[in-house]
Each structure stands twice: as structure tokens, then as C-alpha cells.
């Protein structure tokens, strides 16, 4: 009986632990609500599409330097967030696990910091997003 209840609790908690998948418009609206300039939203949604397919819970495979990328914007753990048991410059001052939650606030704030320090080209997928992009106007 205890095992049954444990399974029920796990089943209830699993969606919360798994993160969530957004779509282009829901991401644009949430980022706008967090104060991201509207003229940047098409670029951010493009980056999120190509980096994580809008999934908040993604941890990328190891990079050539052994680092990993986290969350909807695939933020690197060598420079921007603290992974368990590994050195990091942790410029965003947060755990990498904070980038994997349903609440995208930490991911957005950290991504904005990356942008302010390194520009859009900090994302390897930027070449997909640097030209014409579909308008996000229909999202609002």
C-alpha cells in the first residue's frame, strides 16, 4: 500500500519535475510580461526554438570543454550558472537547476545578462535568427 501511494505521489510530482514546453507565442508573452523589450522577442523566440525547441528542462550534451548548456536558452555552466560539483564563473549567480524550472524568470534574466555582455552571437544558433524573422505581433 505504501508503494502504491509513493507511485501516486511520483505521478503527481513528475510533471512539475519535468519542466514544460512552451510555444512561440506563450514564450513571447511571458518574456514581455517580464519586461523584455518587444523588439527583441522575435530573436529570443528564435533562439529558444533552435536551442531547446521551447523546452525549459533541457540539459544539452557535453560541449568540447566538458561544460553543459541548460534550459530554454541553453545557458552554459562554465560561465553563467553553477552546476553541482563543477567550477563555474557563475556570472548569473544561480544554480543551473534554476534554469530548468517551469518559471522562466531566472532563464530570462540570465539570458539578458549573456546578451548584455556577449551579444546575440553568444548563441551558436544565432545565424538562424539574425536575418528576417516572423513577426510576433499575432501573439499579442
From Swiss-Prot:
Enzyme type, top EC level: hydrolase
Gene Ontology CC: one annotated term: extracellular space
GO BP term, pick one: defense response to Gram-negative bacterium
Name of one Pfam family that matches: Lys
Catalyzed reaction equations: Hydrolysis of (1->4)-beta-linkages between N-acetylmuramic acid and N-acetyl-D-glucosamine residues in a peptidoglycan and between N-acetyl-D-glucosamine residues in chitodextrins
Catalytic activity, EC: 3.2.1.17
Active site positions, chain numbering: 51, 69
SMART domains, sorted: LYZ1
GO molecular function: lysozyme activity
Ranges of residues in domain C-type lysozyme: 20-140
Tissue localization of expression: Found in the midgut, especially the epithelium of the gastric caeca.
Keywords for this protein: Antimicrobial, Bacteriolytic enzyme, Disulfide bond, Glycosidase, Hydrolase, Signal
Matches recorded under InterPro entries: Glyco_hydro_22, Glyco_hydro_22_CS, Glyco_hydro_22_lys, Lysozyme-like_dom_sf
Role according to the record: Unlikely to play an active role in the humoral immune defense. May have a function in the digestion of bacteria in the food.
UniProt protein name: Lysozyme S
Amino acid at each position: 500500500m505504501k508503494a502504491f501511494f509513493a507511485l501516486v505521489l511520483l505521478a503527481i510530482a513528475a510533471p512539475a519535475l519535468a519542466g514544460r514546453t512552451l510555444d512561440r507565442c506563450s514564450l513571447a508573452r511571458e518574456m514581455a510580461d517580464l519586461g523584455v523589450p518587444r523588439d527583441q522577442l522575435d530573436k529570443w523566440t528564435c533562439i529558444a526554438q533552435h536551442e531547446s525547441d521551447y523546452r525549459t528542462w533541457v540539459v544539452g550534451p557535453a560541449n568540447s570543454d566538458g561544460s553543459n548548456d541548460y534550459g530554454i536558452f541553453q545557458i552554459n555552466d562554465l560561465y553563467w550558472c553553477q552546476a553541482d560539483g563543477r567550477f563555474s564563473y557563475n556570472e548569473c549567480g544561480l544554480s543551473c537547476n534554476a534554469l530548468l524550472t517551469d518559471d522562466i524568470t531566472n532563464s530570462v534574466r540570465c539570458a539578458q545578462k549573456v546578451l548584455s555582455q556577449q551579444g546575440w552571437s553568444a548563441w551558436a544558433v544565432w545565424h538562424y535568427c539574425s536575418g528576417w524573422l516572423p513577426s510576433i505581433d499575432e501573439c499579442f
